[in-house]
């Protein structure tokens, strides 16, 4: 086709002039240069008089129903064809052969049921607009052909199923619009062959779920629009492998479940819209990976809480909307990690309290919207915002928060504030210097409840000084009656006077601090004076946030009022409020506040503490401890109580013997007392005293010191006792056992010896004798000295039963040792004799002494051999207490 076109262009001057190559604009169409406009002419077919050198042909808004192949033949220069808004049902597939250089084809708003056949022959086509037709079916091949077109619009059709396209040799597509169809499922990897795609629109379809890898391999995708579907779940890795993705919209769906890691590997995402869904919480899991996010819209959801750590994954966030959710309170440091946040929208929630550190750390915030909550207390009680500093905040919206009083320097923590919106608040009292030190450029308010007395006289001059727009400041008087409905700025300051009997609610008797024991009662009182009716509430601080108390089985609220004469509005009343807490628990240990209100304002008492005390109660008590001399005593004593009890120890003798000998140790944060190397002097009763302001308790334990030791200790040479088969085995563990307090327990191979016919015990079980030993009697034998449930010491003996040959061999070894010693002594004497010097006598005496030593050694070895036949100790293990 391209070769054919070039040939015609070359031969153009040599061909006869025919109608199809006419360059004259004839008929109703309007021609300007290479642009021919035949739109809105009620044409039923394409005119035959259109110049063949046309580059842009506009045929929109006509009545064309079909296009046959003979139309526009020879239009080799045509680049743009607009046949939108007709009633085209059919286009001959050979029609497109006539348009080899067409770049833009607009067929929107027609009645095509399929993508026109032959359109894939348009090798230079860059934009194809099929919006608002009747296309219901798209084949894999047709999708593959579309991959060669840079921009494709198939929105507002009837497509319900999207097949997976076949592999295309040419992929140029950058923008694909499938919005407003009936697609229910996009499957996995459906768009993977469109790897050049930059923008994908799937809004207004019927998609219900986003599965893993739904958009995988679209590494150039920057914008993804899934608005107005029926998506309920977004699965793990649904947006994986999208490194260029910058904008995602999931607004107006039914999303309630967001899997952890759904945005994993989306480091480039900057804008995320999740508004108008059913998201209930902001969690660290699904926020993971959003390190470049700048804009996050979570408005119109069902969020009740958010994890503070979740924001750590979005350090670059600049704009955050939580408008119209179900948040009731803001915890400490709610947005502390969002150092770059510039605008925060928290309007239309149910927020009634802020932690005193809820908004700290937001040093870059420029705009804050707290409208339509119940946060009047944050302004009226200056202590709430005292710890909140926003040095760069320029705009604050605080509309519809039931604000009645603006105290002195209410907004001083926002020194850069320029715009303040207080509309839809029943403001009654604006104290002098309420807006200091601000230099506001815009103030918006519309209150008709102002109490016009001397305290409001400054307002008009302040408005004039700052040159504020008076039309945005509606402040009308409601009291006193002569000034009702007058604008404050229009009243002469001489008429704004104060009386001693102000109608404002005022606390005339502050509550005081209360101390009580756990399980007892606590009572607070608060007296209020002002215009009736007065309302009084009690608040308690819990985890830095106030909570209004309501009456229940353990909380009693009462108000005694003075009589109201004639029931008129101008009357005053004195109300005495009482808060009674019954059966006080440790959880009641907090700060309490009395809040008084009437239509003219509110007053807040100081925060007073309820000190709940609990008498000491032992969690661990010391226990009696038997020990041997030289061992270490360790007594444990621990107690709980409020305030924390002080632990002290006492000994029945004063002073501590161990303390004088510097053997008594107590370490910080340790509930033990240590007595090192105990002696008999340390024996006695030790008493632990736990004391605090609520009371004291004590517990005692006895230290019993014994002086036992084994009479026959052996060196731990690891050699076993050798016993000849059928001989008797005797193990002696004599240790001056006290039979009334102590007992000896024998074990073989760590098992208690209970029933063994040939085992005999004597001397209060201190001696064990085994008769007729066999090879099976070899092993480990131990004797343990016990006092009640405490072991004092243990001795282990290793026994080996051998046959007669092995036993004789061991005896021969002992005899050889004696003979060697004697030979050495004789040799030494012979050497000395050979010297022949004058010290022969001295040397002889030395040799004689050596011989005597050898004899004594031989005797000791023999005694040792005999002793081994009776008792051989392997080791003595002291018991550590």
From Swiss-Prot:
Expressing tissues: Expressed in the hypodermis.
Null-mutant phenotype, please?
Small body size phenotype.
Query: Which residues carry attached sugars according to the database record?
Result: 247, 273, 387, 446, 495, 560, 566, 677
Cytoplasmic compartment residues: 862-881
> Which segments constitute the LRRNT domain?
24-50
Q: Where are the LRR repeats?
A: 51-74, 75-98, 99-122, 124-145, 146-169, 170-193, 195-217, 218-241, 242-265, 267-289, 290-313, 314-337, 339-361, 362-388, 390-413, 415-437, 440-465
Domain of life, per lineage: Eukaryota
Which SUPFAM superfamilies does the UniProt entry name for this protein?
Immunoglobulin (SSF48726), L domain-like (SSF52058)
Boundaries of every Ig-like C2-type domain copy: 503-611, 616-704, 716-785
Q: List the disulfide bonds.
A: 526-594, 637-688, 733-783
Bilayer topology: Single-pass membrane protein; Lipid-anchor; GPI-anchor
- Single GO cellular component term: side of membrane
List the signal peptide residues: 1-20
Its biological purpose is as follows: Binds to the TGF-beta receptors sma-6 and daf-4, and enhances TGF-beta signaling activity in vitro. Has a role in regulation of body size.
- Assembly and interactions? Interacts with sma-6 and daf-1.
Q: What is this protein called?
A: Leucine-rich repeats and immunoglobulin-like domains protein sma-10
Natural source organism: Caenorhabditis elegans
Q: What is the lineage of its organism?
A: Eukaryota, Metazoa, Ecdysozoa, Nematoda, Chromadorea
